[in-house]
Amino acid sequence: MSTIDVILFAFGVYMIVSATWSIAGMFGAPWVPTPIWIVERILKMADLKAGETLVDLGAGDGRLIIWAAWRYKANAIGVEIDPLRCLWANFLIHLLGLRKRAKVHYVSIYETDLLPRADVVTAYLLQSTNQKLEKKLAQECKPSARILSRTFTFPNFDVLKKDPKQELFLYTCKQGTSEKQIL
């Protein structure tokens, strides 16, 4: 293999990786991994129970759904537009023996049909993305579904619980709820 072949191969790999990262950013948010201690805080705040179904919008490397399936014995489903992260997350799920309770689907957050199954929906997206998703969440989620967002809010949903230190916001799927609580 010549030097030019190596350079062209490296450039091709770089372009593929850059394109997948850009695609994820255009369709929801760039990937910013959530530390496990915040993942644990998210799942506690959402009051996730064994056997419930969690849908993580923008699952990234799958750490939240893996934690939900492993530690909470929940049925955890990820939605991810980045094919490499989706592949990696499903590889980790397989490696950890969690395939019966966890899976990441390669689909856009705007096109997923998984929301009606969710008891809990989690999202760490951008403010503009949350605003675009509000109508879909209100139409497709069960009225009892709990929605937890990190950092960015859903402006037309009333916050039920708020953790200002970690910037976590808990909602129910019904618009116009009035009960509020600050942790």
Give names to the regions the model predicted.
Residues R63-Y72:
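Conserved SAM-binding loop of SAM-dependent methyltransferases across substrates and taxa
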Residues M1-K49, L87-P116:
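S-adenosyl-L-methionine
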Residues N75-E80:
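Conserved SAM-binding motif I beta-strand of class I
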Residues S128-L183:
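C-terminal substrate-binding/active-site "lid" region of AdoMet-derived donor-dependent transferases
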Residues G51-G60:
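Conserved class I S-adenosyl-L-methionine
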Residues A118-K132:
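A short SAM/SAH-binding and catalytic strip from SAM-dependent methyltransferases
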